[in-house]
């Protein structure tokens, strides 16, 4: 059986004990592979992504334990974490008060003993996509079951920047989408229709101004940047405040 070397720790591995990556490197399953999240597709990952993901978990777990986990027990409604997940899988905790979201895996060293958690922490404001999809999968009895997922993609993120979160029902997926929509101020309700209309008008004015400046031959970089920012705020919601909250927390962990 062919022998290879783990590109991270240097351990000798074979086809059974090693995981081959997309760039041809191998990592050991026993140690380095276990450091990664189950949600990470190691087959299509390259070595730099694996090492960045491991560093992402080390930092994220520290932030989870020191900042977010204590908020689970907070008596303040404004500080409470919003939890989304399914039994046996990773859970997503959304913290509007800190501007952070954490994907958390729970592990046990022996059966139900030696519980420990590891986490990837993201800035909510970096969330680029949160889309619902469903899949038909076989259960333990061989019968087909419909599984519900939310696909999340984050900008400005090294390591695992995208993952599929399995939730128990379509209703739970809708609740997660609503949670993010409310944070970004883009929920489709009468109460927020004026805010949405204002963002749309600001975007249209900026684009119109940029077009006029271009026609007059005096378009500058600031006008383009402003127009792009206003269009982005209309499509994605104004994320200035939620990003500022996250950066205030993360500054302590750089």
What do the PLM-derived regions correspond to, one by one?
Residues 1-60:
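N-terminal cysteine/histidine-rich coordination modules
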Residues 18, 90-94, 120:
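Short, exposed beta-strand/loop patches in secreted or surface proteins that constitute
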Residues 30-32, 104-109, 155-157:
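Secondary-structure transition/turn motif
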Residues 40-106:
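Anionic N-terminal interaction surfaces
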Residues 85-89, 115-117, 157-160:
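Glycine-centered tight beta-turn/hairpin loop motif at sheet-sheet or coil-to-beta transitions
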Residues 100-143:
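Phosphoinositide-binding peripheral membrane targeting modules
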Residues 128-254:
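Acidic, Ser/Thr- and proline-rich intrinsically disordered linker/docking segments
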